[in-house]
Amino acid sequence: MNIISFDIEEWYIEKHKYGGRPEKYAEYDKYLDKILEKLEQTGTKGTFFCVGGMAREFPEVIRKIDNAGHEIGCHSDEHTWLNKMTREQLEEDTHKAMDSLRQCIGKDVKSYRAPAFSVGKSNKWVFEVLYKNGVRKDSSIFPASRDFGGFPEFGMVEPAVVLSSDTMIKEFPICLTSVLGKQMAYSGGGYFRLFSYSFIKSKMEKSNYAISYFHINDLLPEKLGMKSKQEYEAYFKEKGTLLNRMKRYVKSNLGKA
């Protein structure tokens, strides 16, 4: 089972944190189009976890993704970490986000991912709130310790079912591998930049389950202070850009040749 997913909040964060620079909106639009084009070329469908605020303020972005045949999931309402919310705050946040996305695309939203994978042992009650609001699939668990959280007690690095007396959610945790005795993710975000493509591909091929995750910001050259393809090639010792690496991954692991 190979799953590709994207977390979509850049437009919303740009507007509310940086004032909404037109050139940044244009860049995000361009990279989203490149992603959707590659997924279409390879016959690949993904899940795009979107903040509810995007549905209210940038509905055209959400509808573009939905119209391309991809699943729209929820990524909270304003990208607030779940471990910073009380139960009551999460109830309000989740209801608002799910309702905004539902109204935007005209269909129910069933999948969820917490910003920064901010679900752990101390707030595992999150699943009860999500289930109450219609979530049936989740990908919020980082099953190891990390600088800001993680859920090492979860114990599973494969799809599982979270059960309680009134909750049943299918969980798709982030994939891990052992590096120098430490459990690390390898299939998305900054980790997709950290490891070589051959390393990532070999891990994927040895596993029956792989889930990758990206932000559009992850694919921008300036995220690493690199302004050109040549700088990228010198740093990673491979041809192209990080976007090219993502496309290569989609083609070889998910889509048709």
Each model region followed by its residue ranges:
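C-terminal domain-boundary segment and adjacent tail
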Residues: E40-G43, R193-A257
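Short, glycine/acidic-enriched loop or turn micro-motifs at the edges of active sites
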Residues: E10, E78, D218
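Metal-dependent polysaccharide deacetylase catalytic core of the NodB/CE4 family, i.e.
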Residues: T42-N123, V135, S140-D147, M168, ...
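The substrate-binding groove and active-site-proximal loops of carbohydrate-active enzymes
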Residues: G19-A26, F49-V51, E78-L90, P115-S118, ...
